[in-house]
């Protein structure tokens, strides 16, 4: 995470000073962008996030930017078209502040949740709209991509712990409900957030 210094936020009606960090990741229609190895690794055609293991400080404000390069479609569960757990209950998509997106045009989601041994509950879920662009002017690694849909949001961490995140859009293929392949293989559409 990139250190942005200290910031003041309102928590429970009180001003609180806390560390502010930034993370930037991407979602891709394939694995050709670099992190899975030359030629896209063992599954070059699988959708993927650019990073699996994210690390941020405890008791901090985290501002995430997700560059969404992939197409999409309808969610299995429209619940995940809503923004949850962010500062103000909002996300900014290509400069527009939103609380939800069209559930029939989602590319992926970033859905973060606690695991049982964590003492601090945390649930953040942000829909990443479908990228309708058809041109591919950007070269990243060995892949060709369109200009991304840029999604930005912030959330606050509590005490130390490890949290799981994943995509809730059915983008994996192969199994019933499209939750196989990339969706069921760690490091493609899932990962961890370690709060230190």
Task: Annotate each predicted stretch with a short phrase.
Residues 86-89, 94-196:
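Extracellular/periplasmic metallocenter environments
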């Amino acid at each position: 995470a990139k250190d942005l210094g200290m910031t003041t936020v309102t928590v429970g009606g009180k001003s609180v000073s806390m560390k502010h960090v930034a993370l930037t990741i991407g979602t891709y229609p394939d694995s050709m962008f670099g992190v899975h190895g030359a030629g896209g690794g063992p599954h070059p055609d699988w959708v993927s996030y650019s990073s699996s293991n994210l690390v941020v400080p405890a008791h901090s404000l985290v501002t995430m930017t997700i560059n969404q390069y992939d197409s999409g479609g309808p969610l299995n569960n429209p619940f995940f078209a809503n923004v949850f757990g962010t500062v103000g209950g909002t996300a900014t998509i290509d400069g527009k502040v939103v609380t939800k997106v069209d559930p029939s045009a989602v590319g992926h989601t970033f859905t973060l949740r606690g695991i049982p041994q964590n003492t601090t509950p945390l649930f953040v879920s942000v829909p990443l709209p479908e990228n309708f662009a058809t041109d591919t002017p950007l070269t990243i690694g060995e892949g060709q991509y369109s200009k991304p849909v840029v999604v930005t949001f912030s959330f606050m961490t509590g005490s130390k712990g490890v949290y799981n995140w994943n995509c809730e859009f059915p983008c994996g293929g192969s199994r019933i409900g499209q939750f196989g392949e990339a969706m069921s293989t760690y490091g493609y559409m899932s990962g961890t957030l370690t709060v230190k």
